[in-house]
Amino acid sequence: MRLSYRLVSGLLVLASIVGMSFALYLEHVKGLEPCPLCIFQRVGLMAMGFVALIAFLHNPVSNAIKRFYAFLAGVAILWSVGVAGRHVWLQHLPPDQVPSCGPGLNYLIDALPMKTVLQEVLSGSGECAAIDWTFLGQSLPVWSLAYFLLLLLVCLWQLFRFYPVFKTAKK
């Protein structure tokens, strides 16, 4: 069975919706407060979903445009992979090396320039090292990293897979 570009783009949109729905479920139903790194992971997931939605709706014929959309989606989810990897690393630091807790993300955004906010958030804080939820012995950032890596593989497959070239008939 050959998976069409549009079908895979639709599956990426669906995967983004599922991931965000689960994150919002954990936040609003289970009461888990997302740390700044969690929020940044969501941004990458939503950006990938947005690019995939545009690709799904546009359904380009040009292979170059298909690859461009796949590249943009891959870059977006690569952001989430990087942030989730940093999050996992912070959670595995020895307790004496965990950074102290910093101010909340809303305060940082209101008080500091965006470049400084990015530096502060990506350096992590003590709240990001706390493990509040586990499944099968793994923390939420580990599961998020695995999910994002799977989505990155799909984006890379979309980027590098063979697309048949359709030649138009001459009249």
From Swiss-Prot:
The keyword Metal-binding does not apply. Residues 1-8, 61-67, 162-171 are cytoplasmic. GO terms for cellular component: plasma membrane. InterPro entries: DiS_bond_form_DsbB/BdbC (IPR003752), Disulphide_bond_form_DsbB (IPR022920), DsbB (IPR050183), DsbB-like_sf (IPR023380). Keywords: Cell inner membrane, Cell membrane, Chaperone, Disulfide bond, Electron transport, Membrane, Oxidoreductase, Redox-active center, Transmembrane, Transmembrane helix, Transport. PANTHER family: DISULFIDE BOND FORMATION PROTEIN B. Signal peptide: none annotated. The chain crosses the membrane at residues 9-25, 44-60, 68-85, 143-161. It comes from the Bacteria. It comes from Acinetobacter baumannii (strain ATCC 17978 / DSM 105126 / CIP 53.77 / LMG 1025 / NCDC KC755 / 5377). Required for disulfide bond formation in some periplasmic proteins. Acts by oxidizing the DsbA protein. One of its GO terms (biological process) is protein folding. The gene is dsbB. It is found in: Cell inner membrane. This is Disulfide bond formation protein B. It is a multi-pass membrane protein. One of its GO terms (molecular function) is electron transfer activity. The lineage of its organism: Bacteria, Pseudomonadati, Pseudomonadota, Gammaproteobacteria, Moraxellales. Residues 26-43, 86-142 are periplasmic.
